[in-house]
Design a protein with these regions (language model features):
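Short gly/ser/thr-rich secondary-structure transition/capping motifs
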Residues: 42-48, 101-102, 120-123, 250
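Alpha-helical recognition/docking segments in bacterial nutrient-uptake
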Residues: 2, 60-165, 169, 227-230, ...
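Bacterial carbohydrate/catabolite-sensing allosteric modules
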Residues: 42, 83-88, 106, 136-140, ...
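N-terminal helix-turn-helix DNA-binding module of bacterial transcription factors
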Residues: 1-60, 73
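Short beta-strand segments enriched in small/hydrophobic residues
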Residues: 17-20, 54-68, 174-182
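Acidic/polar helix N-cap motif
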Residues: 6, 24, 100, 155-156, ...
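Generic recognition of short, well-ordered alpha-helical segments
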Residues: 31, 49, 75-77, 106, ...
């Protein structure tokens, strides 16, 4: 792998001059800049984002903390963010927390150590006060504990309402909502609330169930679904909070 010394040797310029080009510091002639750019391309030199950050207050590194990447939502999210950061000349530092608060706190410290210029956070465990005390900007995705942090969120409650209205409109009268994790605050909780609101308004039988954390971690709900259908044979409509759950409902039911 090429180094800054190789670029210096290729161009005949000092390492200091090459470094100034990389960091866009001081006066650099167009000829010098083009010479360095040509050498970088020829040598396929990849500047180390962290090394470049050592002389600055921050880097061109963005941190991303997700609970896991086995779930399609997070794997798709990761792919999209990675593409966006790469296209804009940023590096992405990914952490998988498994939803553990201690792990997430350690990952925040790693972000500090690596001088990230920003963090994308998928966690419901950090209060706005904790987020505001960080020295870099934070964007929360689908998890905004007290509703005050900068966040990108779906209207999950409306999604739950639409699901209930669709099932009831199809003639279903004994509904089950399978959404949310026991003991954890999740976006799916709002879907269950919206689902319940419509069921009460329409006066249909329903039950809202959450599932143990270990099922979410394993992404295997088949035993739970089988038990629900066995214990509630009258069930004629199920609201699944994710595509994974929906596919496993179809697998068990048919």
């Amino acid at each position: 792998m090429a180094t800054i010394k190789d670029v210096s040797k290729e161009t005949g310029l000092s390492i200091g001059t090459v470094s100034r080009v990389f960091n866009n510091r001081g006066y650099i002639s167009q000829e010098t800049r083009e010479k360095v750019e040509a050498a970088v391309k020829k040598l396929n030199y990849q500047p180390n984002a962290l090394a470049r950050s050592l002389s600055k207050s921050s880097s061109r590194i963005i941190g991303l903390i997700v609970p896991h990447i086995a779930h399609p939502f997070f794997s798709d999210l990761l792919a999209s963010i990675e593409n966006a950061t790469r296209e804009r000349g940023y590096a992405l530092m990914v952490f998988v927390s498994k939803g553990e608060e201690k792990s997430e706190a350690e990952m925040i410290n790693r972000c500090r150590e690596n001088r990230v210029c920003g963090l994308i956070l998928c966690s419901g465990r950090f209060s706005t006060q904790k987020i505001e005390n960080l020295e870099f900007p934070v964007v929360c995705i689908e998890r905004n504990p007290d509703g005050a942090a900068f966040a990108i969120e779906c209207n999950n409650r409306q999604g739950g309402r639409l699901a209930a209205e669709e099932l009831i409109g199809k003639g279903c009268r004994n509904l089950v909502s399978l959404a949310g994790i026991q003991g954890r605050k999740m976006p799916a909780d709002e879907r269950s609330i919206g689902f319940e609101e419509v069921c009460r308004e329409k006066k249909v039988n329903f039950i809202c169930l959450s599932y143990p954390p270990e099922l979410y971690d394993r992404l295997d709900y088949t035993a739970l679904i089988d038990r629900i259908l066995t214990e509630r044979p009258e069930t004629d409509g199920i609201f699944a909070s994710s595509d994974i759950i929906a596919s496993q409902v179809l697998q068990v039911a048919f």
